[in-house]
Swiss-Prot record:
Transmembrane portions of the chain: 8-28, 41-61
Protein species of origin: Zea mays (Maize)
GO cellular component term, pick one: photosystem II reaction center
Keyword annotations of the record: Chloroplast, Membrane, Photosynthesis, Photosystem II, Plastid, Reaction center, Thylakoid, Transmembrane, Transmembrane helix
The protein's name: Photosystem II reaction center protein Z
GO biological process: photosynthesis; photosystem II stabilization
Coiled coil: none
Highest taxon listed in the record's lineage: Eukaryota
Keyword Transmembrane helix attached: yes
Function description: May control the interaction of photosystem II (PSII) cores with the light-harvesting antenna, regulates electron flow through the 2 photosystem reaction centers. PSII is a light-driven water plastoquinone oxidoreductase, using light energy to abstract electrons from H(2)O, generating a proton gradient subsequently used for ATP formation.
Family designation: Belongs to the PsbZ family.
């Protein structure tokens, strides 16, 4: 269970980093938002899911 928790936290940190970098690139380009809207929404949905997964795993471990 510890390994699953650590992997979930790593995935959350990696997804957060990618979204921070990707967000700046999307809004900096002229047509970035209209072309990459689905990617941003998918990444945000993944991030929210990982937050809940980390919370559930944390409650099981402690």
């Amino acid at each position: 269970m510890n390994i699953a928790f650590q992997l979930a936290v790593f995935a959350l940190i990696a997804t957060s980093s990618v979204l921070v970098i990707r967000g700046h690139l999307v809004f900096a380009s002229p047509d970035g938002w209209s072309n990459n809207k689905n990617v941003v929404f998918s990444g945000t949905s993944l991030w929210i899911g990982l937050v809940f997964l980390v919370a559930i795993l944390n409650s099981l471990i402690s």
